[in-house]
Amino acid sequence: NISEGFLFYVQPNLENADLANLNVRKALSLAINRKDLCENVLKDGSQAAKGFVPSGLSISPEGKDFRDEAATYTSYDKKAAQAALDEGLKELGKSEITLRLTYGTDESPMDVFATYLQNAFSSLKGLKIEMVATTKQDRIYNKQKNGDFDLSVTRWGPDYGDPTTYLTMGISTNGNNYGKYTNSELDALMDKVANESDANTRWKEMIDAEKIMMDDLCYIPVFEKGTATLQNKDVKGLVIRPVGVPYTFQYVSK
């Protein structure tokens, strides 16, 4: 399985009073069986996301993958999901909420992904899901940009091989922060990351930044897009990257 570097996730609109409740967001994340989605539905080499920074993207000064050094922030627990939703509804003073799930029908595999999410979320008592099918362009440049959504089924691909290509999306002023997430602690930490000269200190700060984002669940990571391929066992030296040119054949030998 080869990572394509893309993270597929759910963007909650935190200007929605129901989604501003952390327990509601926790319920949504816990209701998703990521392993089942990847292995039994997508079946394309994708793997369950463990955090907001995908695996294979960036290596630490000590030579370790960011994902291996950071914590795992995702899990599937239907009972805990229901308990979190029950607590959230209690805090909101409601017995039931309805959320719109927006996705692009012209984005593969968004339709399959969205349907899976609909079933997972709707299985929770007290939560109804309304599907909003549209185009990728309308989803991003109209609905997300104007805040006309509750939950958006979306993805992000790395612009460069550093965790900040994902972590900057948590900054309150970031143009891709469509959910209007604001955390002054994260903003200050990301400012340190941008100006830090010591590589090891910067690495630790980025791990801490992801923890803040995942504790707040400003984004709900679901899976890392992959491609299932076959490679001759005798072929050595093929370099595969999730960013930029995917294959380098310069060092291939047999």
Map each language-model feature to its residues:
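A bilobed periplasmic-binding-protein/Venus flytrap-type ligand-binding module shared by bacterial periplasmic
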Residues: 2-27, 40-41
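Second-shell loop/turn segments in exported
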Residues: 13-17, 24-27, 66-74, 103-107, ...
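Immediate post-signal peptide segment of exported/extracytoplasmic ligand-binding proteins
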Residues: 22, 78-100
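Detector for C-terminal structural segments
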Residues: 31-62, 109-119, 142-254
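Structural transition elements
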Residues: 48-88, 107-110
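Short, well-ordered beta-strand elements
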Residues: 96-106, 129-132
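Short alpha-helix C-terminal cap/hinge motif
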Residues: 117-129
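Short helix-initiation/N-cap motifs at beta->coil->alpha
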Residues: 131-142
